[in-house]
Every structure is written in C-alpha cells, then in structure tokens.
Amino acid sequence: MELGKTKSVHIVGVGGAGMSAIAELLLKSGFRVTGSDLSSGEVTEKLAEHGAIIYKGHRAEQVAGSDVVVYSSAIRAEDNIELIAAEKAGIPVIKRDEMLGELMRYTYGICIAGTHGKTTTTAMIATMLIESDESPTVMIGGISDYLKGSTVVGEGKYMVIEADEYDRAFLKLTPTIAVVNSLESEHMDTYGTLDELKEAFVAFANKVPFYGRVICCVDWPEIRKIMPKMNRLCTTFGIDEPADVMAFDIVLDNQHTTFSIKAFGQEYRDVSLQVPGRHNVLNALAAFSTGLELGILPERLIAGLGRYSGMRRRFQVKYDNGHGLMVVDDYAHHPTEVKATVRAAKSGWRDSRIVAVFQPHLFSRTREFAHEYGWALSHADMVYVADIYPAREKGVDYPGVDGELIADAVRKAGGKHVEFVADMQNLFTALKEWSVNGNMLLFMGAGDITHLATRVANFCREGVAVQGNEDSQSGFAAS
C-alpha cells in the first residue's frame, strides 16, 4: 500500500479503538508510525511491539519529522498542542475518516455501519472471508479474539471496514457494499435530530456504486423508512419482518446460539454461533447476506460464522468458575445495547441471578436516555449504577446530571434492587459480596468500568469467592 511520498504518520489519540486500528494497518504496510495518547495500556503496548513509537501525553515536538498527522473526532483540534504545532510547521493534518478513505481507494470496500452491532458484524464478515481463503484487509474498532487484534493486512481485494457515523465519519468512505445494521437516535451532538441522522445514513448508502449493494436490517423501523431514498440495489435481512434473508428456529443456550436461515427461498440449517443473544443472530444475518453478495458458497459462510469467537468487551467472559459464578464485561453503552446484553444474559443463563453493573457514558447521553436506561436495566435482578464516565464532556456543563438519574429511572421502571455508587472502591466492596455461585456479574459501559470488571474477576480467581446458598447476599431468586 502506498500513499504517494508519505512515509511517516503521527497519530494523535493513538490508544483509541479506531485510531489504533489505523496505526496497526499502517505499520503492517511498512509506514513509520508515531503516536500519542494521554494514557497507556494494552493497546499502546501492542502497537509499540509492532514498531510504533508511542508517547504518553501531548507535546509539540512529537510531530517533528512527520509527513502527515491524523486525529480522531474525539480530539478538539483547536486545543491540541500537537495539531497546532503541525499546522504551524506546514504538516498536513487530517481526520481519521479521511485517512481511512485514502486507504480504501483502490480496494473492494465492505463498510459496516449502524448505531449498534457494527463492530461484531465487521468481525464476523472478516472471519468468514478469512475462513473462505479470501485474505481480506480488515479494520475493526475493537479487538477480535479470532484475529488476535483489530487489524489484518491481507493480500486479497476486499477491505472490510467498521464505518462510524459519529461526526459523519462514514461519509468519507467508499463502499462497494454498505451494510446498514441498525438505526435509532444516537450522537445527537453531531446530528441534532433523528431526521438528520437518517439523512446521513441515506447518503452513506448512496455512496455505493451502481454495481454494488446495500444490505439493510428491516427489523429496525427507521431503516424501513429510509430505504425508499436509497437509490441502489438492496438486500434485506431480519428476524421479525419479512426479508430476503431471515433467521428462524433460534435457540439460545448459555454462550451458544443455534438457528436456521432462509435466504432467497433456500433454507440452511444448523447455523451455530459461539456468542449469545438474538442481537448476534441479526449480526450473523448481515454477515451471511454480505457473503452471498460476494458469491461465496453458503456452506463456507456458515462454517466461517461458526469460527467467530467474539470480541473483547462484547459479552467477554472474564471469569467462570464452572459452578454458576461468572464475571462478564460488555461495551454496551446505549439503552438498546444494554437491553440486548441484559436480555442475552437472562435468556441464555436462566438459572442465574443477573447483577448488572452499569457505568453511564457521557452526561448528554445520560440526560437524553435516562428513562430508556431505566427500562433496559430493570430486567436485571440487581443493578448497580456507577458515576458517569465523561469522555469528551464536562460535568459543569450538565448540572444535576449524574448516575442517580439512571438509578431513579430503574426504580420507576419496576427495578426492585438498585443502588447508585459513585465511588469505584465502594462499588468494588459491594460487588465482593455478590461474588457467589449462581450470580452473573455483568459489567456494561464504554468507559473505564472494564478495569473494575478485571479487578472483580481477579478477586474471584484468587479463590476468595464463596459458595452461594439460599441465604446468600441477595435474598431473592433470579426473575
């Protein structure tokens, strides 16, 4: 892969999921990569192992010698000292999505978009193509167990990209196949209204060339509404609504899911996934539909889906003692994702008490969706709400908005056992008492709640967890 005379790329915010994937792809393609981030961890350490030079913190001198500087939408360009220094030095400064568009230019692009499920669907498609010997290039905004990372540099013609709608980033991509996996209100700080978000998805779909294909999930009402505006060939998929590709005979059993597919009049049985939940059946249908469009034999697609083994922080089991005590970590941060994750836990582990531990992400999202979070979490047997992870926002701009807003919404939705615990140490102390057989401790959120999940899993792994019994902690059975 070549980008003219560009040889050295500096990435601001390199530890982020989407940015680290670009860094990894550039490294594997022979570029010199430097990057900076306010914090270090597993992701930045892995990049360093691949040859990247990683700086902790932002300093002007770190962009010296770079041919281009790349940054994500999460970075405020006017406030970042490295971006300011690059512009003063005449070094081109571009956003992540523009770099992605350049990397895709001469490939057969498969772009997966949607307010939910795009990371998993992208990884499923990647797994299927690799298992079908297509050797794709892949960029995912998360770590795939199968890929052992977020990026693959393949020799084949396909480039599989997770397409992010935040800041309209996906409109810079050039898909030949565009998957629209889901659509509802999200990222209102970018779009302002749901109608504006819908128009962006229409524009994304219409970037497909006349010989390409748009693949749409018709179980989502907002997708059905915008399909008439998509001036391209479409394949539809779903479970509840009539579609070209549909799933039936769905069986959810712990970590495994089985179902059958009817596609364009043909039936395919014994489809098996190593991940739980109806939402993952929809993700698999999106992947299967994509594979059919590429002309891959259905039998190979089904075998590839069976090899998909999950994503880091997508219902990731961090501890399981085999006697009913589990610690699960999930990235769910939108009410619909929280609902799907709790539902997967309740339907797959019917004999377990589900102890949901939720960290809200963003003050604006908490304020906008408090009622919906309450309803989604109320289906768990016990709910702990942590304080809000602010990310790019400041609490002073949102007076009166904290985790108690969601805890109160859970109570109003019928949740009988819910607590707001702002301090992480106090929350850890409370969760130790729940580390008994028969309980699934289900951590959800896009912030640093994952560190608490790891800490609780380590506590359980050290053998401190006690045997559950009729009188243990909760005093009630799983509902």
UniProtKB/Swiss-Prot annotation:
The organism's place on the tree of life at top rank: Bacteria
Keyword Ligase: yes
EC number(s) given by UniProt: 6.3.2.8
Catalytic activity from the UniProt record: UDP-N-acetyl-alpha-D-muramate + L-alanine + ATP = UDP-N-acetyl-alpha-D-muramoyl-L-alanine + ADP + phosphate + H(+)
A single GO BP: regulation of cell shape
GO molecular function: ATP binding; UDP-N-acetylmuramate-L-alanine ligase activity
Keywords carried by this UniProt record: ATP-binding, Cell cycle, Cell division, Cell shape, Cell wall biogenesis/degradation, Cytoplasm, Ligase, Nucleotide-binding, Peptidoglycan synthesis
SUPFAM superfamilies for this protein: MurCD N-terminal domain, MurD-like peptide ligases, catalytic domain, MurD-like peptide ligases, peptide-binding domain
Primary localisation category: cytoplasm
Pathway: Cell wall biogenesis; peptidoglycan biosynthesis
HAMAP family for the chain: MurC
Name of the featured protein: UDP-N-acetylmuramate--L-alanine ligase
Originating gene: murC
